Structure formats: structure tokens, C-alpha cells
């Protein structure tokens, strides 16, 4: 089983702020749930509409907050689709998505838990 988690607004408290990627506050309650699922053997996929240019900062933030994951899917350079269309592609292979945006949940094509 693969469970997907959005970053901004889900694992992190705030929406994406390009100048504040490394300082974003985590949501400990969601991160605890993610860790519990990971320890139970569930594969974790992290998805974000952040541009690929922020991969190193994003990976740093995930390590800083000890967030285990197997896959990190980000927005490819030049991809200007609306977030819900992107999210539907990103969560391919996942069974469940945790996300803060209703539109992402509605179009994801998988069971979604809004947080």
C-alpha cells in the first residue's frame, strides 16, 4: 500500500512560500501519523506543487523533520497546470492522499483525507 501526503498546508502549516522553504513550521500531528504508517510498513509518497527547482530545500526540510518517504514528486519545470490536475498525476499508484485542498481531493482519483 502507498499513502501520499501533500507538503504545504498538510505536512507544513503554511502554503508554499518560496523565500521561506527551510523555515516552514511542521504539523506534528500529521507527521506523527505519517511515521506511524511508515513503521507499519506502508510506503510513503510525498507530493507537492512546488517547482522542481526547490527539490534540495524540500528534501532538506523533510530530513530536518525526520519525515520518512520513498517517493517525492514535484512539479516539473514548465508545468503550469492547475494544482488539481497536477495532483491527479502525482498520486498515481497511491491508495490514499492526505491533502488540505478540497479541489486536489476532488480530482485526485484516490480516497482523500482532508486535513
Cite the ranges covered by each PLM segment.
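Asp-based phosphoryl-transfer active-site loop
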Residues: 1-16
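Short phosphate-binding/catalytic loops that engage adenosine nucleotides
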Residues: 42, 67, 110
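Substrate-recognition "cap/lid" segment bordering the active-site pocket of phosphatases
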Residues: 52-95
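Acidic, Mg2+-coordinating phosphoryl-transfer loop and its flanking beta/alpha structural elements
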Residues: 91-115
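Anion (oxyanion) recognition and catalysis
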Residues: 35-39, 63, 106-109
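Conserved Rossmann-like nucleotide-cofactor binding loop
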Residues: 10, 52, 103
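Short, acidic loop-to-helix structural element flanking the phosphoryl-transfer center
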Residues: 18-45, 56
Amino acid at each position: 500500500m502507498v499513502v501520499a501526503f501533500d507538503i504545504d498546508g498538510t505536512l507544513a502549516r503554511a502554503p508554499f512560500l518560496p523565500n521561506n522553504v527551510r523555515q516552514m513550521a511542521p504539523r506534528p500531528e500529521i507527521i506523527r501519523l505519517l511515521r506511524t504508517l511508515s513503521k507499519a510498513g506502508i510506503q510513503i509518497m510525498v507530493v507537492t506543487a512546488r517547482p522542481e527547482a526547490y527539490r534540495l530545500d524540500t528534501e532538506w526540510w523533510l530530513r530536518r523533520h525526520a519525515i520518512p518517504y520513498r517517493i517525492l514528486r514535484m512539479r516539473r519545470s514548465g508545468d503550469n497546470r492547475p494544482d488539481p490536475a497536477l495532483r491527479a498525476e502525482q498520486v498515481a499508484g497511491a491508495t490514499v492522499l492526505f491533502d488540505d485542498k478540497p479541489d486536489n481531493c476532488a480530482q485526485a482519483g484516490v480516497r482523500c483525507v482532508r486535513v
